[in-house]
């Protein structure tokens, strides 16, 4: 019973966290950016509380084993802390947010270590959000929906095409990886195909070269790992 309750709580918090791109109810003047940030911070706080409570109630619980990938968030944080201009301290809130994202990385690693069954569900939900964003952007390009910026037609649920294109760029390799793993045409297959197809159509209109490069490199890496496997 306790395991089912824990699984349910982790599922709910993970679903809310992955829904962050759509957080923005207009309650703040800068809701498109601020409310998304607050949403992620709030879910991270709840996730931290649940994880710490689980470790406190069960001290013998096995922690997630470290891999070489887990060194990257700490290395990135260290690089940012060393290069940050403390004399003028321009964006302290972003420095704090980056630190919170590093904590969130290790929280998610522990959650997926305890409940590996959630990996498939979170992956599918993440791809579904990418598909929704791609359809949203396509509707904006066709003039069927309003954009969130007066100078850009394509923004999705974001404020401008930059973060929107970046979000599509991180959903594409995940969708490709799941698509390549499918041995038959099932729901994950069609969901991944839909995400890839719509994102490829919309992404060039974002005019984000960094997103294009990210898509090419990440998808090539995923395909190379698939072929080597």
What are these regions (language model features)?
Residues 7-16, 20-23, 41-53, 74-86, ...:
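Alpha-helical transmembrane segments of multi-pass inner-membrane proteins
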Residues 23-37, 56-62:
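Short, hydrophobic transmembrane alpha-helix segments
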């Amino acid at each position: 019973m306790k395991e089912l309750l824990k699984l349910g709580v982790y599922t709910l918090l993970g679903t809310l966290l992955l829904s962050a791109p759509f957080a923005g109810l207009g309650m703040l003047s800068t809701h498109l950016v601020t409310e998304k940030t607050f949403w992620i911070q709030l879910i991270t706080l709840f996730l931290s509380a649940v994880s710490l409570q689980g470790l406190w109630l069960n001290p013998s619980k096995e922690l997630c084993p470290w891999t070489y990938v887990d060194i990257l968030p700490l290395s990135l944080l260290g690089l940012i802390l060393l290069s940050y201009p403390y004399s003028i301290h321009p964006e302290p809130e972003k420095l704090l947010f980056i630190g919170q994202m590093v904590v969130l990385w290790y929280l998610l690693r522990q959650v997926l270590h305890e409940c590996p069954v959630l990996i498939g569900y979170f992956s599918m939900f993440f791809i579904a959000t990418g598909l929704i964003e791609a359809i949203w952007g396509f509707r904006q390009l066709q003039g069927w929906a309003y954009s969130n910026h007066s100078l850009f037609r394509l923004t999705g649920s974001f404020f401008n095409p930059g973060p929107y294109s970046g979000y599509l760029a991180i959903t594409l390799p995940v969708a490709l990886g799941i698509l390549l793993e499918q041995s038959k045409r099932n729901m994950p297959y069609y969901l991944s195909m839909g995400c890839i197809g719509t994102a490829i159509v919309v992404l060039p209109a974002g005019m984000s070269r960094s997103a294009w490069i990210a898509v090419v490199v990440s998808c090539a890496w995923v395909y190379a790992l698939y072929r080597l496997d």
